[in-house]
């Protein structure tokens, strides 16, 4: 927990720090890794690609605007700092989104493109989170980057994962 607090204090935006703290407080089942990153979840198409197309980087390589980013386990996804939308009132805007397991599960179950999708866990650095979109009712956050951990069928039971 100390590592999480240290990393959270490195986030340059006060409103982002408050959004993360609120998100963790309202979602007590959220796990924190020993290095201080928080664990979130994403709902994806069955081929591990994002449901919505968009620009970003996968393992440092730029991807096209109309492509679906590859969220396979082990991949690191990122979004250019200068293009990300910090405004929480813009609910589906530029940046990478992750959320609670329930949020991700809803996306995976309603994946019209490929039938039932998959859910993955992601490790997110608190210093990279930029906002909590207002439509989410504290179920999702927008960030600059995350690392895909693994495919999951349920949320992690542990609060702190070593």
Would you name each region that the model predicts?
Residues 154-162:
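Active-site or metal-binding loop neighborhoods of secreted/extracellular toxin and effector enzymes
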Residues 76-155:
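ADP-ribosyltransferase catalytic core
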Residues 1-91:
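ADP-ribose/NAD+-binding catalytic cleft of ART/PARP-like enzymes
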């Amino acid at each position: 927990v100390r590592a999480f607090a240290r990393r959270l204090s490195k986030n340059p935006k006060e409103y982002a720090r408050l959004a993360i703290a609120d998100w963790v407080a309202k979602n007590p089942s959220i796990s924190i890794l020993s290095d201080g990153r928080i664990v979130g979840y994403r709902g994806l198409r069955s081929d591990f690609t994002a449901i919505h197309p968009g620009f970003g980087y996968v393992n440092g390589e730029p991807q096209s605007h109309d492509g679906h980013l590859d969220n396979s386990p082990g991949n690191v996804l990122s979004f250019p700092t200068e293009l990300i939308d910090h405004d929480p009132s813009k609910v589906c805007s530029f940046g990478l989104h992750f959320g609670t397991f329930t949020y991700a599960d809803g996306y995976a179950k309603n994946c019209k493109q490929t039938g039932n999708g998959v859910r993955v866990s992601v490790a997110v650095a608190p210093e990279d989170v930029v906002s909590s979109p207002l439509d989410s009712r504290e179920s999702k956050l927008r960030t600059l980057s995350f690392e895909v951990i693994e495919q999951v069928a349920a949320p992690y039971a542990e609060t702190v994962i070593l």
